Curated annotation (Swiss-Prot):
Cellular-component GO terms for this entry: cytosol; glycogen granule; protein phosphatase type 1 complex
Designated name of the protein: Protein phosphatase 1 regulatory subunit 3C
UniProt short sequence motif PP1-binding motif, positions renumbered to this chain: 84-87
Assembly, per entry: Interacts with PPP1CC catalytic subunit of PP1 and associates with glycogen. Forms complexes with glycogen phosphorylase, glycogen synthase and phosphorylase kinase which is necessary for its regulation of PP1 activity. Also interacts with EPM2A/laforin.
Originating organism: Rattus norvegicus
PROSITE patterns: CBM21
The encoding gene: Ppp1r3c
Length: 317
């Protein structure tokens, strides 16, 4: 074998010159031999095999794409369980509900057994019972200041005001300060002076008063049942310096009388059975009075009598 042929064997690329059959057979034989094929292969084949057998880079354990895909599937409404419709008969229940109504009417309630119209007719046919009440049979003493001051100067004791509420009589008494030790009592009777009771009064501290007079208060509970034929009267006694001063409303006593409320709203006084009571007829017209007269002022504005003169604002003298 010549050198030229050896070069041809080592270099399988075709030559420009003519190739002999022996050379072709030699190439075919050498090409099918594994050791020589791997050794005599072209550089391009070696380079291609090197890239094929090169190890690939490792992939991360956590796949971001798969995590995003799982989140997308979790947020997607298709991932929720589908709703199913189950009928009652599939579980052994009835498909219909039966309600039975009775033709008999129910018993009416006791508080609704009457209609409003029936109640109106019944109330119009009823007669109102006469209700007995107790009222004072005297005006408030301090309403007429001039008269009150005169009586106070003369008797040294005088009832100032009085009220009746819930069958309890309360009031205040004015007395002259003639001594340090004083005793004021209210003597009251509920059976036309067959018996009487003395009730002690309580001293009240005068904040804006003078040293010439003192004020006492009292509270008397009336009996629950008082016959209409019996009189309820009281007076006031004042003990000072061994003397007793009385205020008995100019010898008439202070009276509490029974009255009856008629269905028409008129209030009439009940007269005792043992005496003849004459009721003064009501005046149909008011008597004309001079504007600014004491009678008109005392009836409408009793305090005007004390506002008109400065000396009336002083203590009772």
């Amino acid at each position: 074998m010549s050198c030229t042929r050896m070069i041809h064997v080592l270099d399988p690329r075709p030559l420009t010159s003519s190739v002999m059959p022996v050379d072709m057979a030699m190439r075919i034989c050498l090409a099918h031999s594994p050791p020589l094929k791997s050794f005599l292969g072209p550089y391009n084949g070696l380079q291609r095999r090197h890239f094929v057998n090169k190890p690939k880079p490792l992939k991360p354990c956590l796949s971001v794409k798969q995590e995003a895909k799982s989140q997308k599937e979790w947020k997607s409404p298709h991932s929720q369980a589908k709703k199913r419709v189950v009928f009652a008969d599939s579980k052994g229940l009835s498909l219909t509900a039966i309600h039975v109504f009775s033709d008999l009417p129910e018993e009416p309630a006791w508080d609704l057994q009457f209609d409003l119209l029936d109640l109106n007719d019944i109330s119009s046919s009823l007669k109102l019972h006469e209700e007995k009440n107790l009222v004072f049979d005297f005006p408030q003493p301090s309403s007429d200041y001039l008269s009150f001051r005169d009586r106070f100067q003369k008797n040294f004791v005088c009832l100032e005001n009085c009220s009746l509420q819930d069958r309890t009589v309360t009031g205040t008494v004015k007395v002259k300060n003639v001594s340090f030790e004083k005793k004021v009592q209210v003597r009251i009777t509920f059976d036309t002076w067959k018996t009487y009771t003395d009730v002690d009064c309580v001293y009240l501290k005068n904040v804006y008063g003078s040293s010439d007079s003192d004020t006492f208060s009292f509270a008397i509970d009336l009996p629950r049942v008082i016959p209409t034929e019996e009189k309820i009267e009281f007076c006031i006694s004042y003990h000072a310096n061994g003397r007793v001063f009385w205020d008995n409303n100019e010898a008439q006593n202070y009276r509490i009388v029974h009255v009856q409320w008629k269905p028409d709203g008129v209030q009439t006084q009940v007269a005792p059975k043992d005496c003849a009571f004459q009721q003064v007829p009501l005046k149909t017209e008011l008597e004309p009075t001079v504007f600014g007269s004491p009678r008109l002022a005392s009836g409408l504005f009793p305090e005007w009598q004390s506002w008109g003169r400065v000396e009336n604002l002083a203590s009772y003298r």
